[in-house]
Amino acid sequence: MSPYCTLHLHNVPAGREAEYAAWFDGPHRKALASLRGLVNADRFEVSPIQIMPDIPQPWRYMSLYEFDLPNAAIDLPALGPLLADARDAGLVADEDESERIYSYRMYSDWKISPNWQRDQPLSGVSIILANYTIGRYAEYQDWYDNVHSGEVINVPGHVGMKRGELSELQIEPRRYCPGDQLVLCAQQTDDLLFTIRDFSARAGGRSPSGIAMQPRSSSGSTARTVHYFNKISGDRFWKGGVAYGGDFAPYKAAQAAAQNK
């Protein structure tokens, strides 16, 4: 068995958003049950809160399909006709050829932190369409596996990460992909702004937690785009609050001190 993820990044014609949502959670989800190796499928909408606000967000929606496939060459392309149903019904706005379907062979399943409440659904996910610096692939993998992944998933509201590499197996339409490395992060937070701000604070050594990330490795190319999405599909949603296995006391103290100034 091999883990894969397929991202369907798309836009929907104005006025047909509810129709697409009903299709995804109705006929489409029913059809997905016939696919071998499908582990999970959910749909997300781009968040107004982004860690890199100047980066364009070309897609309003993303559908995420997670697989554990017995034979990827046979099974992965089977998703294609099911996605084509939405396109054929006019539910995908693609006049600008913005639709993207990217499939990644994942290096592993989720790496999780004590933050993750496994009995609860995610509030959202973020993706990085990433690249490594040429000639430094092994260093890039080591940095993510042994340093940066742990730093990220322990930020309040961030709960897990898994990574992968762009697969040779792709679903039509095959179009330009800006990153051959995928960094997929899971969130459980109803305060994404707090989560993102503390991520940045830890990266800069300014977090009330006292936790500071190591300097970013130059083995990770700056040619990357980051996209945060909120979960919109299914009938179970994050219960509220910010998932964190650590101590919130330093954050509360910092907030109180700021209010007293």
Can you describe what each PLM-predicted range is?
Residues 1-261:
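Macromolecular interaction modules
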